[in-house]
Amino acid sequence: MNELVRGLTNLRSLRAAVRELTLEQAENALEKLQTAIEEKRANEAELIKAETERKERLAKYKELMEKEGITPEELHEIFGTKTVSIRAKRAPRPAKYAFIDENGEHKTWTGQGRTPRPIQNALNKGKSLSDFEI
């Protein structure tokens, strides 16, 4: 898509592309491009009109609220806020295995994820996982 945009916005690229087309093909492409641009303009105009109408409605509601003596806080009390269900974090799993790493530090492992290198080396040498249980 970037290549197409670059080609359409660069005059030299357009000239090179048009050289390879017949006049009829170039005019056909021009008509289609103009149609697409007109559709884009109409779409943009609709969006601007909808936003303008929305702002007018909001201004009308604000004026009506002021006329009736209603405050935004009162509306907030009535409508409240949307409650977003936040998924609670899972509690960390307790450690099941203890080992001493290459630096001589005492470490623990929950049993999930990749097996720590010292435990894996011991398992490769014939030890059992139960040898490391806490």
Swiss-Prot record:
* DNA-binding region, residue intervals: 112-117
Keywords, alphabetical: Cytoplasm, DNA-binding, Repressor, Transcription, Transcription regulation
Q: Please provide one cellular component term from the Gene Ontology annotations of this protein.
A: cytosol
Q: Name the protein family.
A: Belongs to the histone-like protein H-NS family.
Identification of the protein by name: DNA-binding protein H-NS homolog
Q: How does it assemble?
A: Homodimer that oligomerizes on DNA into higher-order complexes that form bridges between disparate regions of DNA compacting it.
Function of this protein?
A DNA-binding protein implicated in transcriptional repression and chromosome organization and compaction. Binds nucleation sites in AT-rich DNA and bridges them, forming higher-order nucleoprotein complexes and condensing the chromosome. As many horizontally transferred genes are AT-rich, it plays a central role in silencing foreign genes. A subset of genes are repressed by H-NS in association with other proteins.
Source species of the chain: Haemophilus influenzae (strain ATCC 51907 / DSM 11121 / KW20 / Rd)
